[in-house]
Amino acid sequence: MSIVNIAAYKFVSLPDTVLLREALQERADALGLKGTILLAPEGINLFLAGSGEAIEAFLAGLRADARFADIEVKYSTSADVPFGKMRVRLKREIIRMNHPAIRPEAGRAPSVNAHTLARWLEQGRDDDGREVVMLDTRNAFEVDVGTFRNAIDWRIDRFTQFPDAVREHRAELEGKTVVSFCTGGIRCEKAAIFMEDIGIAHVYQLEGGILKYFEETGGPGYDGACFVFDERHALDPALKPV
């Protein structure tokens, strides 16, 4: 049986994380799912694996809560379940940046979809004629597995270092169209808002991250694989473990 893997997140106010944790843990356990769900006052971030039927049943229940009705999901498959346990964890942030003023729920930076980005990369410029630079917001060890060709990589060890790296290197970005990207979209969403907040113009986030880019385009302009935080370790542009 092929295992279905999903990744999804949403920035949305969650004042009831303790109760939500109990409900989601119970539902996931009942369906035999494995993986991790992170809950914080700012939203939800999840990585789950199981049978296709169980995954869809879980998502139906999740989307029955109006706060998650429009949550977008990225799918892949594997021969085995890449997680050993099912954990629902409470965190201060679903992706730690240590900048509480960055609240994606209050307003996102502009995004670029996979097909538009593929066209920009082929052209070498955006639709307004500006040079496009790809900014990798991931940790250095993730970048080493694969990244977009000629992407900017500041060799950060954790996402909390990103704001200082932007301030130090912002001259590299001035006058260009900057597309921030990450695995599934969550880090690049916060990164793009931060760059806008400090006055960098023409900033976009890659909608759905690398995984959605692979899913929709097959990965043109990307060299290598995409590191993932589970037992598969990395996925190729066909979303298969390498």
Swiss-Prot record:
Coiled-coil features, chain-numbered ranges: none
Catalysed reactions, semicolon-separated: uridine(34) in tRNA + AH2 + O2 = 5-hydroxyuridine(34) in tRNA + A + H2O
Enzyme Commission number: 1.14.-.-
Residues making up the signal peptide according to the UniProt record: none
Record keywords, A-Z: Oxidoreductase, tRNA processing
SMART domains per the UniProt record, alphabetical: RHOD
Transmembrane annotation, as ranges: none
GO MF annotations in UniProt: oxidoreductase activity, acting on paired donors, with incorporation or reduction of molecular oxygen
UniProt domain Rhodanese: residue ranges: 128-222
Class of this enzyme: oxidoreductase
Residues annotated as catalytic: 182 (cysteine persulfide intermediate)
Name of one Pfam family that matches: Rhodanese
GO biological process, one term: tRNA modification
Family: Belongs to the TrhO family.
Function field: Catalyzes oxygen-dependent 5-hydroxyuridine (ho5U) modification at position 34 in tRNAs.
Protein name: tRNA uridine(34) hydroxylase
Source organism (scientific name): Bordetella avium (strain 197N)
